[in-house]
């Protein structure tokens, strides 16, 4: 099933990451040291905080509404699909059941990040820019921050499946962080699947469970739908890309994203004030 979409999707993966991937493919294969990362960073502490934010977010820091976005894309059911329980995945710029969400799920200011596991710019963003954004808007429950995948390569697909394998936000954040931190050690290796399997096992996903997830229609169709949806956005040129209530930001700098978020927060406050005065 995957082979029918990887090639056309790959053509959409443009300037943001192409040069870096070409250069890195020629690097000498490195040995991955995942255990050291798991022991020496404070990922688990951040995971717990993010999970608490997602599950126990304040209900009305910014009042929720149902009128944020209207565009949606539905992926057609596969002709080869045999499982009648798998339904076409519908994607919008709102929060849905398939999304991995940090912060306040009920906020009506929704920031959607599109990233690729093999994208060097995405790794840079998460290591240098995201922590400040998280502290300012996510930890304070001001926004719903949705992390979605753009699948450009087979490596992207397999890494994204590993991150979603357990299905909960804690596990997703753990693997999301490690996959990006260790990107140069697995993404361009001929043994990338073996290295991802090692990452999974050290993070609590045994090889057999990872194999089952790789064969999961539900996970794969979610990733396909996420990718196809953003690929149809008029201004989408690559990853990372950000949308605030459906409007794409200029770039992935802290200033650009903060300006867009602050504007959306102010608009929602004014809207709430006007509704109360009626």
UniProtKB/Swiss-Prot annotation:
Q: Is Cell membrane set as a keyword in this record?
A: no
Task: Give the Enzyme Commission number.
Answer: 1.8.-.-
Q: Which GO terms describe its molecular function?
A: disulfide oxidoreductase activity
Q: Which residues form the Thioredoxin domain?
A: 77-266
Signal peptide coordinates: 1-18
Cellular component, GO annotation: periplasmic space
Please verify whether the record's keywords include rRNA processing. no
Give disulfide pairs as residue numbers: 119-122
Polar residues bias: start-end ranges? 65-81
What keywords appear on the UniProt entry? Disulfide bond, Oxidoreductase, Periplasm, Redox-active center, Signal
Q: Give the enzyme's main class according to its UniProt record, as a single word.
A: oxidoreductase
Identify the PROSITE patterns for this entry. Answer: THIOREDOXIN_1 (PS00194), THIOREDOXIN_2 (PS51352)
Q: Where, per UniProt, does this protein localize?
A: Periplasm
Entry-linked SUPFAM superfamilies = Thioredoxin-like
Q: Where is this region: Disordered?
A: 62-84
Q: Which family does it belong to?
A: Belongs to the thioredoxin family. DsbA subfamily.
Described purpose of this protein according to its UniProt entry: May be required for disulfide bond formation in some proteins.
Q: What is this protein called?
A: Putative protein-disulfide oxidoreductase RF_0032
Where does this protein come from, organism-wise?
A: Rickettsia felis (strain ATCC VR-1525 / URRWXCal2)
